[in-house]
Swiss-Prot record:
Keyword Repressor: yes
Entry protein name: LexA repressor
Alphabetical keyword list: Autocatalytic cleavage, DNA damage, DNA repair, DNA replication, DNA-binding, Hydrolase, Repressor, SOS response, Transcription, Transcription regulation
Pfam families assigned to the protein according to its UniProt record, in alphabetical order: LexA_DNA_bind (PF01726), Peptidase_S24 (PF00717)
Length: 242
């Protein structure tokens, strides 16, 4: 029989996989289960592996696979529903799904040959480490499933660096950005610093300052006066090649 925490984590991972196609990050799991450290998540995952409920796909990011769920008789009753906590996390990691007819064009995209996909401009590499200048090479386009996109204009960027790995964003990943100059606290954004540098970080407003937070303890949070940072878009999706 699983412990309550093991069962809650299994439900959490299964729900996230069904919703997004990949498992939640360790930070999201830690927050959802109200644990103080990621080591607790590691222990729970190892226990679920040993009992044959989970499988880890090694050398892949956020690659947990639910093999089976416990039978009803052996399931503990969780104190709270595991899908309720903000593991759904920053809105950036829950891509909007467009409902209804897709016969009309979406602003900012080109139609792809596949009716279920559109082509977004691929603007180059963005730093998830030290900021680098984004390239606007609009001769490159990327085919993206249409249900990843919300309203408005979108573009894609390739990630360079490792400062967002705890948010499940790795060097070489392609991020899908919804163009916007507004973002809520905690959202992962494309930030333009001093009109010269572009970086992908989590945004935090602190009075008259803006903090750009990494998701890797080896990198430091950078804090700027609010007038030095402009939001260029919000992260809504991620593509990865294996």
């Amino acid at each position: 029989m699983l412990t309550r925490k093991q069962y809650e984590l299994l439900l959490l991972i299964d729900g996230h996989l069904r919703k997004t196609g990949f498992s939640p990050s360790f930070e999201e799991m830690k927050a959802a289960l109200n644990l103080k450290s990621k080591s607790g998540i590691h222990r729970l995952i190892s226990a679920l592996e040993e009992r044959g409920f989970l499988r880890r796909r090694h050398h892949r990011a956020r690659a947990l696979e639910v093999i089976r769920m416990p039978e009803a008789a052996s399931m503990p009753v969780p104190k709270t529903a595991p899908s309720a906590p903000s593991f759904a996390s920053p809105p950036a990691f829950t891509p909007n799904v467009i409902q209804g007819s897709f016969s009309s064009r979406i602003a900012g995209v080109r139609a792809a040959q596949d009716a279920s996909a559109v082509q977004l401009p691929l603007y180059g590499r963005i730093a998830a480490g030290m900021p680098i200048e984004a390239l606007r090479d609009t001769s490159a386009y990327l085919s993206v499933p249409i249900d990843m996109l919300g309203n408005g204009e979108h573009y894609a960027l390739e990630v360079a660096g490792d400062s967002m790995i705890d948010a499940g964003i790795f060097d070489g990943d392609t991020v899908i950005i919804q163009q916007s100059d507004l973002a809520e606290n905690g959202q992962i954004v494309v930030a333009l610093i001093d009109d010269t540098e572009v970086t992908l970080k989590r945004l935090r407003r602190r009075g008259k300052s803006v903090a750009l937070e990494p998701a890797n303890e080896r990198h430091e949070t950078r804090i700027f006066p609010a007038d030095r940072v402009r939001v260029q878009g919000r992260l809504i999706g991620l593509l990865r090649r294996y």
